[in-house]
């Protein structure tokens, strides 16, 4: 899998060669538009990122049964049923801080929503984003993939986790 980091991209347009100028990338950076700011707090609301129903709710105070694993575990996320190929939208404005592939959640995107809050979207494919990208609420984060082996009985689903300063929070508390 290829993970794109926009901060590392280097194109001839950035160096001024296509415009015929000798302006350096450093000079162009000084005149670039300011970075988008994001803000989220305990009173903010999240849009639903997928159209399905919750098949496993957030539960960090008691264990819940995971059918595929045939065991009880704590669940730091909300697991939302969906159709493979379904578009997953950002629940809030954010900046992409991580794109990775894990055994449990497959292709996973993390958005910094501001003020210590992050949203984690797992079980994705065809992610059109790169680290550093600004994503507006409702904008495509990726498309739902087939489930990993950890969720094969549950079927295609979105792994949706919200954290505050690295600590898992119940996404349902913030949902519209």
Write out the residue ranges for each language-model feature.
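Short, small-residue-biased leader/transition segments that mark boundaries at the very start
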Residues: 2-3
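Generic structural motif
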Residues: 50-54, 82, 86-96, 122, ...
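Intrinsically disordered, low-complexity
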Residues: 6-52
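Zn2+-dependent peptidoglycan hydrolase active-site motif and core
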Residues: 90-125
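Short glycine/threonine/proline-enriched tight-turn/helix- or strand-capping micro-motif at secondary-structure
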Residues: 33-37, 59-89
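Extracytoplasmic
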Residues: 41, 49-53, 65-66, 73-77, ...
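Conserved, short, structured surface segments that act as functional micro-motifs
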Residues: 133-176
């Amino acid at each position: 899998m290829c993970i794109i980091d926009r901060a590392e991209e280097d194109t001839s347009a950035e160096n001024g060669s296509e415009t015929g100028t000798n302006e350096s990338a450093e000079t162009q950076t000084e005149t670039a538009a300011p970075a988008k700011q994001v803000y989220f707090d305990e009173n903010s609301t999240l849009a639903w990122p997928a159209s399905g129903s919750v098949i496993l709710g957030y539960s960090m105070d008691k264990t819940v049964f995971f059918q595929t694993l045939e065991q009880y575990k704590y669940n730091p996320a909300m697991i939302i049923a969906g159709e493979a190929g379904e578009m997953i939208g950002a629940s809030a404005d954010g900046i992409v801080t991580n794109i990775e592939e894990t055994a449990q959640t497959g292709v996973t995107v993390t958005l910094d929503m501001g003020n210590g809050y992050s949203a984690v979207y797992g079980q994705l494919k065809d992610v059109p984003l790169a680290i550093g990208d600004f994503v507006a609420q409702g904008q495509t984060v990726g498309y739902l993939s087939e489930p990993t082996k950890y969720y094969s009985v549950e079927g295609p689903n979105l792994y949706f986790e919200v954290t505050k300063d690295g600590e898992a929070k119940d996404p349902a508390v913030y949902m519209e």
